[in-house]
Design a protein with these regions (language model features):
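Positively charged n-region of N-terminal signal peptides that target proteins for export
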Residues: 1-4
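Bacterial N-terminal signal peptides
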Residues: 6-15
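N-terminal signal peptide c-region/cleavage motif recognized by signal peptidases
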Residues: 17-19
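Gram-negative and organellar
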Residues: 22-306
């Protein structure tokens, strides 16, 4: 963990020397912000989503507070998020998740930008565990030679700590994991809020606990089209292949899950309101019969930004 923050501090210093802040002092702008969002999730799937896993119905509340300090070419941002999940139904537990983020965006020239980010998650759900704490560092380069085309490449390193949960069994114990993630993204802008986007990702986690090890490759495409000034629709599809190195399928081989999830989103953003709805079908093909399933996930959320 200390190594990640030391690396980020070193890079921040190289990208933005103290003299830059002095030269731009007259143009710095400070902007605090916040967001409150209430949502409802209904799902028939054990599919894992970052921060939320629901097999049934749940009400969610998201609270976000942050502050941004920006000049013409540099932006610092600090942000804190908390999410409450109240799973409906007798005997179903509720929980909360926290996330803290520090970000620096720096324009290098008219075409290039770099992002440096440090992030801390407390008690969130990952592919390999139900109760994970994570500290991560990220470097992202953006190349936008013209407004119609944007390319991004990012690399991050994650350090994870796992607390055992009842689903892990009576012999489970606290363990750690670590590993890289690489993302490549392309977005083609066709007009205002009118985009085609494609994303590729490769990631892995290594751990002394074989049950926590996995590798994953994924790809996604989406198309965003405005229907009027405030309303747009976004169909898309995502495919994910995950191999769990310390788990065995019914065929005696390493457990391998392939998931494909077509979805459609509606986004209505009148003024400072953010009203969003998503319908997703989830199909998982696995050599572990317990994980071989199909399901759906429906989400609607109303948020206000200020």
């Amino acid at each position: 963990m200390k190594g990640i923050f030391a690396l980020c501090s070193l890079i921040f210093g190289l990208v933005l020397p103290p003299s830059a802040a002095a030269q731009d002092d007259a143009r710095w702008r400070f902007d605090p912000y916040g967001r409150v969002e209430l949502g409802f999730v209904s799902a028939e799937s054990g599919d894992r989503e970052e921060q939320i896993v629901v097999d049934g119905d749940a009400v969610t509340l998201r609270l976000q507070a942050g502050a941004e300090l920006a000049s013409d070419t540099t932006t610092f941002q600090l942000e804190a998020d908390r999410i409450y999940v109240d799973r409906l139904g007798e005997g179903r537990s509720s929980y909360q998740r926290d996330r803290f983020t520090a970000t620096l965006d720096q324009e290098l020239d008219s075409d290039w930008e770099i992002r440096l980010q440090a992030r801390r998650y407390d008690d969130f759900i990952t592919a390999e565990a139900n109760d994970t704490d994570e500290t991560s560092g990220l470097v992202r380069f953006t190349y936008e030679p013209e407004r119609a085309h944007r390319f991004r490449l990012s690399a991050s390193w994650r350090e994870r700590e796992y607390d055992p949960s009842p689903e892990d069994g009576p012999d489970a114990f606290a363990t750690t994991g670590r590993g890289p993630r690489v993302d490549a993204e392309y977005r083609h802008r066709l007009g205002r809020y009118h985009y085609f986007a494609a994303d590729l990702r490769a990631e892995s986690i290594a751990s002394d606990d074989a049950f926590r090890r996995y590798s994953r490759q994924s790809g996604a495409v989406s198309y965003t089209r405005p229907l009027n000034h405030d309303l747009r629709v976004r169909p898309g599809v995502e495919a994910i292949h995950t191999r769990f190195g310390g788990r065995t399928g019914d065929d005696g081989e390493v457990r391998s899950d392939f998931r494909i999830a077509p979805e459609v989103e509606l986004l209505w953003w009148p003024g400072q309101w953010r009203i969003e709805a998503e319908a997703k079908a989830i199909f998982i093909d696995s050599n572990d019969e317990r994980r071989d399933r199909a399901g759906y996930r429906l989400t609607i959320a109303a948020g206000y930004v200020f």
